[in-house]
From Swiss-Prot:
Reaction(s) this enzyme catalyzes, per UniProt: Hydrolysis of terminal non-reducing alpha-L-arabinofuranoside residues in alpha-L-arabinosides
Organism expressing this protein natively: Penicillium parvum
Disordered: annotated segments: 59-85
Pfam family, one: Glyco_hydro_62
Protein name: Alpha-L-arabinofuranosidase A
Secreted among keywords: yes
Domain CBM1 residue range list: 17-52
Stretch forming the signal peptide: 1-16
Location in or out of the cell: Secreted
The organism's place on the tree of life at top rank: Eukaryota
């Protein structure tokens, strides 16, 4: 995701106005619905509108808010890109950065990235692994350019949240972080300030169920207008789904689930993520797999989150992302990560015109045990 050079622009804030890159509308939003001078309230989806520089806007429309006044907004992406729409490609080809950051002293690995846009910058949480092979979690200090990730602070969380899944839940104006390995298979915490890694609420159970012969792993949350969905894997060749009415979230999904995809163990292994494709009546699911040449991702599409999924890019030789098409020279593995979202809300929107993927890679010559493999962040950018 690329933000405008005008990030450095400072606009005067008047009482009752939302700041540049602040929220200004959406269903359930009770805050300011007008922006500071020079910024326009920009529609992203029914739950989220954001103050963006007016110079990036083209066409006006009305946003959905519960306010008594209606704000004139424009159709532009939350990443301040063009208003054009794109389809997902049938064949993917990427370019890749090198390693973007190294773990601090005492740690061997940075993994499982979850990234959201936040006030015009990137906010990233991740799992970390220390020299003894023990897992924890951290946040990176805010940064505007991916090349600056290497110098961003790494802020260890006092309460570990392994495999974090971070988003803004607009209906209740809170930030949510889901994760694994707690009192229940999946847990969640909430916060009003996601930049404070130790400002999260006490953990609550997100899912209490079990799966035969394995354990639930890698929670992925996404919502439509009426329903919140939980997708997860099991390192066993299956992908699972649970759901609840959106008005009940955040709370425990309980123990019930549906198996929605089945294949061999390595063909549907872990790290499932689900996104809404902007400008299309389509959702994208990616799943990490194990191949002859390392970790790679297969992709599936659907027209509804509660519906069936159609294979899209599913072979190791022509994957969604892997050694065959990543363009990376420093890693064979394209492993657990997050597509860069165009806004941070619970609908998980991605812009296929500007698709990027924050992933974990590693030196392929490393022979350490899995927990001690030297994973680092890298960024793929789709070649169109």
């Amino acid at each position: 995701m690329m933000w405008l050079a005008s990030l450095s622009l400072v606009l005067p804030v008047v009482a009752g106005q939302a700041a540049l890159y602040g929220q200004c509308g959406g269903n359930g939003w009770t805050g300011a619905t007008t922006c500071v001078s020079g910024a326009c309230c920009t529609y992203s989806n029914a739950w989220y509108s954001q103050c963006l520089p007016c110079s990036t806007t083209l066409t006006t429309t009305k946003s959905s808010t519960t306010s008594s006044s209606t704000t004139s907004t424009v159709h532009s992406t939350s990443t301040a890109t063009s208003t054009s729409t794109c389809s997902l490609p049938s064949v993917y080809k990427w370019t890749s950065t090198g390693s973007l950051a190294n773990p601090e002293s005492g740690f061997v690995s940075l993994k499982d990235f979850s990234a959201v846009p936040y006030n015009g910058q990137h906010l990233v949480y991740a799992s970390d692994v220390n020299n003894a092979g023990n897992y924890g979690s951290l946040s990176f200090g805010l940064f505007s350019d991916w090349n600056a990730m290497s110098s961003a602070s790494q802020n260890v969380m006092s309460h570990g949240a392994v495999a974090p899944n971070l988003f803004y839940f607009a209906p209740k104006n809170i930030w949510v972080m889901a994760y694994e390995w707690g009192a229940s298979p999946f847990m969640y915490m909430t916060s009003s300030d996601p930049t404070n890694p130790n400002g999260w609420s006490s953990p609550q159970s997100l899912f209490s169920g079990s799966i035969s012969g394995s354990s639930p792993i890698d929670p992925a949350l996404i919502a439509d207008d009426t329903t919140m969905y939980l997708f997860f894997a099991g390192d066993n060749g299956h992908i699972y789904r649970s759901s609840m009415p959106i008005g009940d979230f955040p709370s425990n999904f309980g123990t019930s689930y549906t198996t929605i995809l089945s294949d061999s163990t390595y063909n549907l292994f872990e790290a499932v993520q689900v996104y809404r494709v902007k400008g299309q009546n389509q959702y994208l699911m990616i799943v990490e797999c194990i191949g002859a040449n390392g970790r790679y991702f297969r992709s599936f599409t659907a027209t509804s989150l509660g519906g069936s999924w159609t294979p899209q890019a599913t072979s190791e030789s022509a994957p969604f992302a892997g050694k065959a098409n990543s363009g990376a020279t420093w890693t064979n593995d394209i492993s657990s990560g997050d597509l860069i979202r165009s806004s941070p809300d619970q609908t998980m929107p991605i812009d296929p015109c500007n698709l990027q993927f924050l992933y974990q890679g590693r030196d392929p010559s490393s022979t350490a045990s899995y927990n001690l493999l030297p994973y680092r962040p890298g960024l793929l950018t789709l070649v169109r």
